[in-house]
Curated annotation (Swiss-Prot):
SUPFAM superfamilies: Translation proteins SH3-like domain (SSF50104). SMART domains: KOW. Pfam families: KOW, ribosomal_L24. GO terms for molecular function: rRNA binding; structural constituent of ribosome. One of two assembly initiator proteins, it binds directly to the 5'-end of the 23S rRNA, where it nucleates assembly of the 50S subunit. GO terms for biological process: translation. Part of the 50S ribosomal subunit. Belongs to the universal ribosomal protein uL24 family. InterPro entries: KOW (IPR005824), Rib_uL2_dom2 (IPR014722), Ribosomal_uL24 (IPR003256), Ribosomal_uL24_CS (IPR005825), Ribosomal_uL24_KOW (IPR041988), Translation_prot_SH3-like_sf (IPR008991). NCBIfam families: rplX_bact. This is Large ribosomal subunit protein uL24. PANTHER family: MITOCHONDRIAL RIBOSOMAL PROTEIN L24. The keyword Ribonucleoprotein applies.
Length: 105
């Protein structure tokens, strides 16, 4: 199956405690069907002190399931489904089904 969510995409969270929030995808883990989104699903982690880094409690992003994310429409920022289209020059690109705008390229 082709990747509907890619690194660098702006996505909207559909369910959970961060519902409605949007952020940029930092990393996609296709085997686990999860993604890391900047500023979304933050958890507190206890960090041990090292020579390079100070110890303490830090906030970091936790992975969120891809089924709880939707790509943001480039036109208005609302969640949209993703389709694929082949252009005249033969490139396969993603487009927003909500507005018809191209997501990449």
């Amino acid at each position: 199956m082709a990747a509907k969510v890619k690194k660098g995409d702006t996505v909207v969270v559909l369910t959970g405690r961060d519902k409605g929030r949007s952020g940029e995808v930092i990393q996609v883990m296709p085997k686990e069907n999860r993604a890391l989104v900047r500023g979304v699903n933050l958890v507190k982690r206890h960090q041990r002190q090292t020579q390079a880094q100070e110890g303490g409690i830090i906030s970091k992003e936790a992975a969120i399931d891809l089924s709880n994310l939707a790509v943001a429409d480039p036109k208005d920022g609302k969640p949209t489904r993703v389709g694929f289209r082949i252009l005249e020059d033969g490139r396969k690109v993603r487009f927003a089904k909500r507005s018809g705008d191209l997501i990449d390229g």
